[in-house]
């Protein structure tokens, strides 16, 4: 096992905990209205925390020479890239974070499921989620759909969103994505966002459709991503 793999494995729990605290801090800064003394005290604490984090920059998977990558490090790079992703990364304080899994829908069809709860720091319209954030979550969840049919690496050719009603904050949201059509290198997937209703049911707040294009094998050769990064 490489030194990098050992180091990142050892720091992961602390990194996840730190990101949770920063995420909560962002929500508190957005929510609270303290006096100037409290603001100055908080600023000093944050400045001290930033000073404590002074260290060399973390290398991304694409910055690591192939000659340095063994099997253990490849696994670690994959995990590390996921940990820092914009929407589902547990170590990225900007991530909600989104929890992604696979399952089946009511018809028994395979789906990618994204579960998330958005607080007031993600607000767009009054007491509702920002539409751009909803679109970004759709993009992330839909990116898993090609793997349901073993389509291999793909790139997004088009993403369209239809907003049916405002998406509420501070509730458990569920995103579902499925493949609806595949022809040659092209694949179409659709998704929906479900929010709970007061009567115990759910309603669709937005829908999305994405066109993916498979990457030709010749384009993959010599450019494999050891971390499966998006």
Language model: regions and residue ranges:
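Intrinsic-disorder/low-complexity, polar/charged segments enriched in Ser/Thr/Lys/Arg/Asp/Glu/Gln
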Residues: 109-113, 158, 172-174, 186-188, ...
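Active-site helix/loop of acyl-thioester processing domains in fatty-acid/polyketide metabolism
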Residues: 103-107, 132-151
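Long amphipathic N-terminal alpha/beta scaffold segment
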Residues: 39-121
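Short histidine-centered catalytic/ligand-binding loop motif
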Residues: 118-132
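Residue-level recognition of well-ordered beta-strand positions that form the cores
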Residues: 115-117, 160-162, 176-178, 192, ...
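Hydrophobic beta-strand-centered segment that forms part of the acyl-chain substrate-binding groove
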Residues: 141-174
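HotDog/MaoC-like acyl-thioester-processing domains
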Residues: 2-70, 74, 167-169, 180-230
């Amino acid at each position: 096992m490489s030194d990098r793999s050992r180091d990142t494995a050892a720091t992961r729990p602390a990194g996840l905990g730190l990101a949770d605290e920063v995420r909560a801090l962002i929500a508190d800064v957005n929510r609270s209205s303290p006096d100037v003394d409290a603001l100055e005290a908080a600023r000093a604490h944050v400045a001290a925390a930033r000073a404590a984090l002074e260290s060399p920059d973390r290398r991304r998977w694409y910055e690591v020479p192939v000659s340095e990558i063994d099997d253990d490090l490849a696994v670690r790079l994959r995990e590390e890239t996921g940990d820092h992703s914009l929407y589902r990364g547990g170590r990225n304080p900007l991530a909600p974070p989104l929890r992604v899994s696979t399952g089946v829908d009511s018809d028994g069809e395979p789906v990618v499921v994204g579960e998330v709860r958005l607080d007031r720091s993600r607000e767009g319209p009054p007491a509702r989620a920002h539409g751009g954030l909803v679109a970004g979550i759709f993009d992330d969840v839909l990116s898993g759909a090609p793997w349901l049919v073993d389509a291999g690496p793909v790139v997004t050719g088009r993403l369209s969103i239809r907003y049916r009603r405002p998406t509420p904050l501070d509730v458990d949201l569920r995103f579902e994505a499925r493949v609806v059509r595949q022809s040659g290198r092209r694949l179409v997937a659709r998704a929906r966002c479900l929010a709970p209703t007061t009567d115990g049911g759910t309603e669709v707040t937005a829908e999305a459709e994405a066109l993916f294009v498979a990457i030709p094998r010749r384009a993959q050769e010599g450019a494999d991503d050891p971390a499966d990064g998006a």
